[in-house]
Amino acid sequence: MSKVIGIDLGTTNSCVAVMEGGEPVVIANAEGSRTTPSMVAFAESGERLVGQQAKRQAVTNPENTLFAIKRLIGRKYDTEEVRKDISISPFKIVKADNGDAWVEARGKMYSAPEISAMVLQKMKQTAEDYLGETVTDAVITVPAYFNDSQRQATKDAGKIAGLNVLRIINEPTAAALAYGLDKKKDEKIAVFDLGGGTFDISILELGDGVFEVKSTNGDTFLGGEDFDQRVIDWIADEFKKDQGIDLRGDKMALQRLKEAAEKAKCELSTSMETDINLPFITADATGPKHLTMKLSRAKLEALCADLLNKLEGPCRTALKDAGLSPSEVDEVILVGGMTRMPAVQKRVQEIFGKVPNKGVNPDEVVAIGAAIQGGVLRGDVKDVLLLDVTPLSLGIETLGSVMTKLIEKNTTIPCRKSQVFSTASDNQPAVTIHVLQGEREMAIDNKTLGNFELTGIPPAPRGVPQIEVTFDIDANGIVHVSAKDLGTGKEQSIRITASSGLSKEEIDKMVKEAEAHSAEDKKKRELVEARNHADTLSYSTEKSLKEYGDKIGADEKAKIEECLANLRKAMEGSDVEVLKKATDELTQASHKLAEAVYAKAQAEGAQPGGEAAGEASAKDEKVVDADFEEVKDDKK
């Protein structure tokens, strides 16, 4: 079995790791960074940029630079969370035919899994460059509080990226795996994970290689992006008060504000005050305007007070569901970049009554845990058992539009539960079952997973047919449904009408497009490498020709000059094969010139070298020994 990579697909940044020699290793990307911005941009030239390249040009291309797409994955367009995102996004969020929230860039619509797949492809490429081999198997992490649609959409993203997703694993569980792999004692831990876009809290019991999740809770729309937005709004309001200009109407200025807000927030984790300087932020009739402000840590905490207050509720619920008091938790592990904020750490300390553990790298620990889980699935990591839970209850709509729960939240997965249903009227040929996920009492307030129609029921009085419906949650937390007529013993045919998500045809189409892009990217890379090689060769040949051109014949010199001109012309084009051919021709033609350069170098080195050789032969061996001793002394 080939290597299994672990990918932390984050809202703001992503990270990839792999097991090497029994140890997890975080892989640096082509830019040398261990995390990659989860950003995708479409340039005017049609080129697709991912990661750091996309982030660098965001200010000048705000409408076509897509970020925080994880907050849209598996979500409907007509939801409160998406509406909130639409109001602050510089890029267009549009409604797809199936009702999902998609994005638009350069006039083309993309699904959230498709954009996420582009980030995953970048992570896959990073791993392949490091390992020197093709990678297909992966473990991808998701927030623990992701529902079925969001998990399925993440799995679809992996498929589009050309990955075989062996397992979808919850981020706090992955972090616990990384933290507790070498721990020998039994302990109860809380993993507090506040990232760029999501918040999770999981309570686990660790001991003897068993990682058992007792409860999980969270908010899939609370993270660093929300804290940044508070700072952006404050800067924009202050500037409007001072200059009378609202920067929110200028997408380019808004993108600069976003970068400045993120930078200021990060700086205030280590200092009490920071300067925000944005020269030439805008202009009016009086001339250009510059933005200069000071932001203190106290002000930042005041701006984000309500966001900080939102952290407590899920923690209290998770503790209650696990049947533990805060004092019974041995360690609180901090995960996610936002946990570097002192106010967050203080709030965690207040909730749990203990100083949180900062022993793990909050940006990398989730990817490390995913790589360890990959090692478990591959058989490289022994004696580790992971018992995760389903974050949300699963049930169906019953009489009076009430949700009847079949599988309660925090049930260990994989799990299976069956329930017998019957008909509501005489001779009813079909039953429609509305499957729901959530914690609310009424069906309308929960998330619809699908409507399952059981057809071909034999004519019978109401309440007589016995139809057993089985709900199954797999190890990825993804729901499956099957049905059986107990009267006939036959499996009933179920037609599933997915409420959202991508169809198989759409996924297959996106897989093909992703493969085409991958081949295109490879060609571009080949062209860049060929151009670089050609540029180096033409420069060195031209230099050598100036210095040693008189050492070769006129015909040979003319031939080299001709090949040099051909290579320069080929470098202007974009045909790799033509470029390689021109490079080879110049290399062949330059052989005589290379010989002349080499001969001159030898001649220059031969005279002093010859004298030294003569001296050495004229002296006895002791001198050679002394010479050898000197070298050894130098080394010391």
Curated annotation (Swiss-Prot):
Family (UniProt): Belongs to the heat shock protein 70 family.
Protein name according to UniProt: Chaperone protein DnaK
Conditions for induction: By stress conditions e.g. heat shock.
Entries under PANTHER family matching the protein: HEAT SHOCK PROTEIN 70KDA
Protein origin, superkingdom: Bacteria
Gene Ontology cellular component terms for the protein in this record: cytosol
PROSITE patterns the record matches: HSP70_1 (PS00297), HSP70_2 (PS00329), HSP70_3 (PS01036)
Main function: Acts as a chaperone.
Residue numbers of Phosphothreonine PTMs: 198
